[in-house]
Amino acid sequence: MKYIQSLRLRTLPLSVSGIIVGSGLAYPLMPPTNHSFATGGFWAIFILAIATTLSLQILSNLANELGDALKGTDADQHGRAAYGLQSGTITKEQIIRMIWGFAALSVLFGTTLIYSAFGSLFATPSLVFFGLGLLAIIGAVTYTLGRHSYGYMGLGDLGVFLFFGLLSTIGSFYLMTQTLTWEAVACGAAIGLPCVGVLNLNNIRDMANDRIHGKHTFASLLGPIGARVYHTLLLIGCLLLFALFGHYWTLCIIPLWAWHLWFLWTHTERLDTHMPVLMFTTLLVALLTLV
């Protein structure tokens, strides 16, 4: 149980949103004979993509905790529950072993996923996806870990958009259909925007502390007002992109996101209480694309 807090399980539903969107777009394009799990079709690829993504997300969470702890960024987060490493319930050596373990799981699930999709580990598409998988692992680890962690250089938002949005959606779509459409690209961008919003909300909350410890997030560069304008545009952009390709059911989320934005614009504290709101409404938006 002492490891559970460091896994940050509440982030996991958000991480699969792109897989849901990409898979939903791919399903109607696949022949019914490819819908069987036994034939390595839709459901096999979907489940393996989910497993790979969850492993990568937990890997990122663990590396993020270790990186922030080593840099001292999480040492003065008043009003927040301490994670395992910060509270002393687990050691640095234990969390490093967990990082290696989930990196290995990511490779295992990812390799099985690639073979299930292409029937070979050495075909050109397979090699491309191996390269993308390696980039995903590097991106998961180096967000806050290492001397040149991109999360400390204002590039975290771009990383989330690329990995949670474009790669997650387009990757799952291509693995299932072995083709690419503009709708898949646009929907990948669309679901990536509120995922960036989750990181932005986190960075607005931690803005003062991040500046003290030299963590230059995009939110800290924009300032409190600019970061809120940016946040608003992320959510509006998401809905506009989905509506552009006929996913009108996603507009049902407007009342919840309007409430979320009202809270963000009228509060400077307790922003952490809206982190689950944005995470689960983003997942809901992904599910609404299936309607």
Residue spans for each PLM region:
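Membrane-embedded alpha-helical segments that form the functional core of polytopic membrane enzymes
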Residues: 35-63, 128-141, 182-201
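Topogenic membrane-insertion module of multi-pass membrane proteins
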Residues: 1-44, 48, 143-151, 160
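Functional transmembrane core segments of multi-pass inner-membrane proteins
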Residues: 160-207, 225-226
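Multi-pass membrane catalytic core of lipid/isoprenoid biosynthesis enzymes
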Residues: 76-120, 215-246, 280
